């Protein structure tokens, strides 16, 4: 765990394409954005305790999108904390187990990048443990201290979040810095045209810090770098 800005902490390591989760302290409450993998819940709880807090202080868990590396730890964390679970309504049916995630298919745009991940997921995938969504959120809503942006493209219900006081953007998988800096993972983006529109919208925020779904956060020249993706 590292502090990205006052009251903003980054969790995650090298697993799952260097997937990241973000823990916010605000108004005496904790908000978690994404939950890492199925067996990462204990690590998130340890991070909460290292802040001098208790699991019950986690009031809300917000999901950027319903892909395994971002919601895997949700069931364990919901059980341990009782936190309210929030996601976009399109993703809610996947999180709750009523519908499978939409696939890039057997003929993805970048097969040599996609197939190894698909094989790895197939060989190592535990069964998704469904968790009902407590509240659907969308564009213009608030999730604790965060402003919600609907940024479809990578998935239809993909959300990003903005913390105005630090000009901090959480892009989810709309932007990645691992294995390279790029507009998300193109091989896994379902609608490139929507994704391009979403990138333009995020670039207009002129964020000073960008926390991404996979890879290290962008802390220098963040606004210029995001504009360069548009």
Language-model region placement:
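Metallo-beta-lactamase
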Residues: 3, 36-39, 92-152, 190, 194-207, ...
């Amino acid at each position: 765990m590292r502090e990205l800005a006052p009251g903003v902490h980054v969790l995650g390591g090298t697993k799952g394409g260097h997937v990241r989760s973000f823990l916010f302290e605000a108004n005496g409450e904790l908000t978690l954005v994404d939950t890492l993998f199925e067996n990462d819940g204990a690590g998130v709880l340890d991070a909460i305790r290292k802040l001098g807090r208790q699991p019950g202080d986690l009031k809300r868990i917000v999901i950027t999108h319903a892909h395994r590396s971002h919601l895997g730890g949700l069931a364990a964390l919901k059980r341990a904390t009782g936190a309210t679970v929030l996601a976009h309504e399109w993703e809610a049916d996947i999180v709750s187990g009523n519908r499978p995630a939409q696939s890039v298919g057997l003929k993805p745009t970048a097969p040599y990048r996609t197939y190894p991940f698909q094989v790895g997921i197939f060989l190592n995938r535990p069964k998704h443990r469904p968790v009902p969504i407590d509240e659907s959120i969308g564009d213009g809503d608030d999730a604790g201290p965060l402003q919600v942006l609907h940024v479809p493209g990578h998935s239809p219900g993909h959300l990003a979040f903005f913390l105005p006081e630090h000009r901090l953007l959480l892009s989810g998988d709309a932007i990645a810095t691992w294995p390279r800096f790029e507009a998300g993972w193109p091989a896994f983006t379902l609608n490139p045209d929507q994704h391009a529109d979403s990138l333009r919208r995020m670039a207009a925020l002129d964020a000073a810090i960008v926390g991404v779904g996979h890879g290290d956060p962008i802390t220098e020249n963040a606004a210029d770098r995001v504009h360069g993706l548009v």
